[in-house]
Structure formats: structure tokens, C-alpha cells
Amino acid sequence: MIYSKEIVREWLDEVAERAKDHPEWVDVFERCYTDTLDNTVEILEDGSTFVLTGDIPAMWLRDSTAQLRPYLHVAKRDALLRQTIAGLVKRQMTLVLKDPYANSFNIEENWKGHHETDHTDLNGWIWERKYEVDSLCYPLQLAYLLWKETGETSQFDEIFVVATKEILHLWTVEQDHKNSPYRFVRDTDRKEDTLVNDGFGPDFAVTGMTWSAFRPSDDCCQYSYLIPSNMFAVVVLGYVQEIFAALNLADSQSVIADAKRLQDEIQEGIENYAYITNSKGEKIYAFEVDGLGNASIMDDPNVPSLLAAPYLGYCSVDDEVYQATRRTILSSENPYFYQGEYASGLGSSHTFYRYIWPIALSIQGLTTRDKAEKKFLLDQLVACDGGTGVMHESFHVDDPTLYSREWFSWANMMFCELVLDYLDIR
């Protein structure tokens, strides 16, 4: 059993009662909330949990965490659901040990995915091997939040310890990518799907930050130090120190020391290289930098993003640099900010021109203190569902019936998270 239907039903009724003035939200919320549990989650023979991303038959380390995070509230009551989430952490960490550079995996060693087009060190477990810093942040985040929200500790097993060490090692290696074994070339006409310089990536200088090949959108980085992902790494490295200290896990002293060193060096790199100025002369965060003086002003509509920095726990919503960055991102200075007849928000090179992402709209709502803005965004999300009653990867700002991805569970669950936030269920 994945969860207790009675407990979840009772909780859904409580949410519906609290949101009774917004029945249109409740309708979409219930559909999205139950769909992920009923149609994407599978308990495997070893007791671990596999979470399908939706209409692609694979599990992303990033997406799967975000898909189950909104269930932490009810997992306090539901022991079955707690074990399902703990099982996901176990599956994620097992897969990290299959290959820490991969972003998405198969349910078994079946060699499905991009094996015919991708030139990189593949194995049968890997759906895609695009290295993204955040892919390694998310399992650590879920393990920590599950512990803090519910008290569950079964996820902190030997595999967790070994995988955490592997993550720390990889991030250390990638502080100077010249020492890295990772290369990635795809046979494609789409430049965003492959790395330049024979798979090595663009030029860079050492900064203290950790290198990333691809963004959370699965498009390649223009410059190799992705600031939002390094912010996320700083946060989860703090989680690692807290977990190993509080629970006295194996090799805790050395793991804590390594995590602290990495955290300090990455944070120093952010402070030394991430700050730039916008067109108004305000100090803001760059999206990507290369350590050679180049930087980009934009944002990714996925998470981690600059917009999501407070959501990730990196800074306060009220931080002056964050607020200036937020204003810049949500303006025409960001080349991927689109305004249209039905909506405005963040798009991506990963999707069509003038298509914006519901995930980014949800994050916009989750990173404001303005209740009216949250309500506006929830109303907009429901109105722009293309008549389907669920969220999508992206939709056209002038015609929401034009959208990408019929079934995208991550977007569904980010909508649910914003509803819960609006109702002060945090």
C-alpha cells in the first residue's frame, strides 16, 4: 500500500473546507493530488519507491522529490505514506550510486532512454545522463524534510551515508571541472541538448562553486556555474551537517567536515562572482557565470531558480538583492519573460516562444508575502489549464489551449503546494 486512502481522504476534505470559497482550486487540487499518488508511484520488490515523472517513462531525481514533497503534511498522520516517501529517498540514493552524473533513471536495468544518440558513460539503469547539480541536491532535501516534518529516520541507512559521501566527492571534483571524467555529446541539431568542446563544456575559471553541465530544464548551461543550483547546494550541505551531527551516522565527523568546507567554498564563490547589476544599476544575482567575467541575466522556470531562492531556504523573501533580482526576472530584461492576453511569466529555451511554465507561476506565489498575488496566480493557473483540469509543462500566454506535455506531475504538485501555502498549511 502506498498510502491510507481513509487518512488522505479525510485530509483532502479538510483542505476543501478551508478552500471552500475557491471551489475551482479545490477541483484541480484534488485531481492533481490524487493523480500523483495513484498513477506515478510504485512500490518495488525491495520496498523502495519509484516515481514516474508523468508522460515520460522514467524517474528524475529532481522531479520525484518535488512530486512527493506536498505529501509531507499528511505523512505526519499516515505511516504508509511516510514509508513511501522514505522508500523514494532509498531508491534515489541507490540510483545515485548507479551513476551520480545521471539526472533520470529507468525502473529497472532495461537500457531504455537516449542510448542510441548520447556519447557518455551509460549503463542500463540510466534514462538520461545530463549532469545537473540540483539532481544531487533534491534527494538530500527530501531526506531532511521528511525527518523534520515527521520524525522519520529509516531513510538514513548505509546507502544514504555512502551516497552522501559520493555527492560530496563529486561536487569537490567539479569545483575544477578539468579534473572531471564527465563528458556529454548528443547526436542532435538542437544545441541546447549537447555540450561544446567535444562534450567538455564551455570555458571557465575556478571559482569555488561547483560546475554544472545542464540546467533544471535539461538544457545545457551557457556558463558553467549555475548560481541557483549552487545556492541550493549551500542549503543542502547545511542539511547534511545537521543530519550527521544529530543522528551520529557513520563517519559523521569526516562527512560534516567535508560538507562544511564545501558549503563555505561554494558560498564564497557565490559572493565573489554572482553579483552583477541590472539595467537600473541595482545589485542582483546573475543566473550563470563562468569565472572569466561573463554572466547572464535570466532565469530558469524550473526549480532551482533565482526566483525560488527563498523557497529553497537560501535567503529571506525580504532580502534586498533577492527583491531586485525578482523584479528583474519578472520584467522584459529577462529574455524569457513573456506577457500575453491570458498570463505573464517565465518561459524557457526548452519550450516554444511565448510559452510560460506553471511551475514558475507557482514559485512566484510561494515567494511572495502578498496574499493577493498568491490568489491572482492560483486563479490564473486554473484559468490556463487548457480545459484539462491539470497543469502542464508550459502554455502559450495568448492561448492556454496550446500547451506542452499532457501529463507532468511536477507541475501538478507545485500547484498543490501553492494552494496549501495560500491556506497557511506549511
Regions found by a protein language model. Name each.
Residues 61, 97-104, 108, 120, ...:
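Extended ligand-binding clefts on enzyme/binding-domain cores
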Residues 36-46, 110-119, 203-215, 336, ...:
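Active-site-adjacent bridging/hinge elements
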Residues 28, 32, 79-95, 152-172, ...:
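Extended, well-ordered alpha-helical scaffold segments
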Residues 118-124, 129-132, 296-316, 354-426:
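C-terminal capping/lid segments that line or modulate ligand- or cofactor-binding pockets
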Residues 1-62:
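Low-complexity, Ser/Thr/Pro/Gly-enriched N-terminal "stalk/linker" regions
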Residues 57-85, 89-191, 409-425:
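Aromatic-rich carbohydrate-recognition surfaces in CAZymes
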Residues 7-21, 66-79, 138-153, 231-251, ...:
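Well-ordered alpha-helical scaffold segments within catalytic/enzyme domains
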Residues 123-130, 134, 155-158, 220-224, ...:
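Alpha-helix capping and helix-loop boundary segments enriched in small/acidic/polar residues
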